[in-house]
Amino acid sequence: SYDSLTVVFGIASDKDIPGSLRPLAQAADKVIFTRATGNARAARPGELARTFHEISGKHAMTCPDLADAMELAVRGTNREDVICVTGSFYL
């Protein structure tokens, strides 16, 4: 078991973004949106955060790349928390 679930999420812009974000709204305590560096198809983190807010009413954090997102996730968790990195496997 764990205390808190932080999700680091990135996805290609041509995927079913709303369908992918709905489960996050139910399961995650914190969400950090990011994108794969050098992938032209990657959805922009700010757009993902806006769509997530429209779907869930919840706010999320954004980072320009995976390294920054992971640093933010690690800083915001403790030993009883879980970090899940998911989305398109370009990350």
Provide a role label for each language-model segment.
Residues 18-82:
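C-terminal helical cap/extension that packs against the catalytic core
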Residues 7, 31, 85-88:
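Residue-level signal for inorganic ion chemistry
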Residues 16, 91:
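Short phosphate-engaging motifs
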Residues 1-11, 17-21:
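Metal-dependent phosphodiesterase/nuclease catalytic metal-binding core
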Residues 11, 35-36, 89:
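Short secondary-structure boundary segments
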Residues 66, 88-89:
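Helix N-cap/beta->alpha junction signal
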